[in-house]
Amino acid sequence: MAKNIQAIRGMNDYLPGETAIWQRIEGTLKNVLGSYGYSEIRLPIVEQTPLFKRAIGEVTDVVEKEMYTFEDRNGDSLTLRPEGTAGCVRAGIEHGLLYNQEQRLWYIGPMFRHERPQKGRYRQFHQLGAEVFGLQGPDIDAELIMLTARWWRALGIAEHVSLELNSIGSLEARANYRDALVAFLEQHQETLDEDCKRRMYTNPLRVLDSKNPDVQALLNDAPALGDYLDDDSREHFAGLCKLLDAAGIAYTVNQRLVRGLDYYNRTVFEWVTNSLGSQGTVCAGGRYDGLVEQLGGRATPAVGFAMGLERLVLLVQAVNPEFIASPVVDIYLVAAGAQTQSAAMTLAERLRDEMPGVKLMTNHGGGNFKKQFARADKWGARIALVLGESEVADGTVVVKDLRSGEQTAVAQDSVAAHLRTLLG
């Protein structure tokens, strides 16, 4: 007997019972994006490796440890995308979307990182991201955060997420801070673990989000990034905070928040939760005004964010279980009798024409009424339509509300209107 082939570790199947809630959550997210004027862009999952090295930074954990990189038959180095911003910028440059234009784009799809699989974090994971190009003021940063806050309200999780903000300043301000931080860390190398010692010279800002408690205690005495901000960045951040205050969005300024990718400048933010065990990030982003030029385009201000959908689904299920998936079907058509199958299928097609979007399933495979009603329950149907030989003969159909048990005979010509009333 041949050995079963199983899914790769950290790359999951999502079965019909799970995908229904994914679809409802994704639908909510997409509706909000549309209400803010964002358009979808669809991007390849494989890109040239230099794209990510240039965008993310060669000494980041993502590039050094986590990317799935391989050579194709032509000897070109390709990588499964570990994040979406770099590909979105590449597409914007390649297709001329960014030159002297404002763009508001969103994307959704699988990303890939070779890291240890754990709850809510997998090697293939799904991400929704939004990017804005051509706007440089704090007002668009604030609107992006307002958009995400609207998501949390729509999903019923607003009380379970909190916003952390920081400004990491301009490239020049960050370079000055980097020198001060390295000088401080050099004086306390005995407290640093090996990972922090390596990062101290390659990417010292990443030491700030070390999970090592000894390092975290040491950083209480480290220079503060906020003390090194340039005047423009201070003004930008103050403007952002003022707009969020006016919108009633609570936040905490976290001066250790730096994000893990090299392309960020000025605004960075994270929405975090404590409702999944240890604190976890639900959504994160910031401003990256230099990335378009870095990847070969003209200098273009940009800001965006990304969100891991696996963690979001877990959070919604944990704190708002009433946000249940829509039923697989609204209506199940039960047919019994040798002469009813053709009439049932004809009625089903007519109802699909008259009720666009209705989820209607016709029974196939025979079975008595008891078995067919059991199938209707299995598929989560709200209403059963019962068509027997007598109903076919007199042009009626029995409409049964499977929640209340009430049923009534309705003329087939008017059943669509009756169903609309029942389904609301």
From Swiss-Prot:
UniProt keyword annotations, A-Z: Aminoacyl-tRNA synthetase, ATP-binding, Cytoplasm, Ligase, Nucleotide-binding, Protein biosynthesis
Top-level taxon of the source organism: Bacteria
Catalyzed reactions: tRNA(His) + L-histidine + ATP = L-histidyl-tRNA(His) + AMP + diphosphate + H(+)
GO function term, MF aspect, one: ATP binding
GO cellular component, one term: cytoplasm
Subcellular location: Cytoplasm
Gene3D superfamilies cross-referenced by the UniProt entry: Anticodon-binding domain, Bira Bifunctional Protein, Domain 2
Pfam family, one: HGTP_anticodon
Example of a GO biological process term: histidyl-tRNA aminoacylation
Chief place where the protein resides: cytoplasm
Family: Belongs to the class-II aminoacyl-tRNA synthetase family.
Annotated protein name in UniProt: Histidine--tRNA ligase
Classification lineage: Bacteria, Pseudomonadati, Pseudomonadota, Gammaproteobacteria, Enterobacterales
Name of the encoding gene: hisS
